[in-house]
């Protein structure tokens, strides 16, 4: 799956993409294993069954490279677009026409404090609720 985010620098502020994928379009009210969170900033971060997995047990879980997916990082001040590539094998999906996925996206300034902003698609999407994500159908 290839995603391209344009306009990731806005008013001199960098915005970092997050991708939420429900590979089987289960539309669950809460996260389950097999539902993925991908974040691209100065490192690549991922969560299988949970979002916002930056650290676990005090250990940084983000890195410059991750198995099964990639994103252009670290961004520079001149970065205008961010590419994200996720293999279907990472998602546990055989890419066949008609296969349905749940998808949502966010752009965030990733400050980690009260000034943090997030912009979602769809606008009604909620990070913690995969049933608010939109349907995508492979062709």
Enumerate the language-model features and the residues they cover:
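Structural preference for beta-rich elements and adjacent junctions enriched in aromatics
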Residues: 1-139
């Amino acid at each position: 799956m290839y995603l391209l985010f344009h306009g990731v620098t806005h008013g001199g502020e960098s915005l970092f993409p997050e991708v939420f994928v429900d590979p089987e379009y289960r539309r669950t009210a809460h996260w389950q294993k097999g539902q993925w969170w991908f974040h691209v900033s100065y490192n690549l971060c991922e969560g299988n069954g949970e979002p916002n997995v930056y650290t676990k047990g005090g250990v940084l879980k983000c890195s410059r490279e991750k198995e099964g997916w990639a994103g252009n990082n670290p961004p520079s001040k001149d970065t205008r677009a961010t590419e994200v590539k996720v293999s279907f094998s990472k998602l546990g999906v055989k890419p066949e026409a008609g296969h349905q996925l749940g998808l949502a996206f966010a752009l965030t300034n990733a400050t980690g404090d009260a000034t943090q902003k997030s912009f979602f698609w769809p606008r009604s999407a909620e990070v913690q609720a995969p049933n608010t994500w939109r349907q995508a159908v492979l062709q």
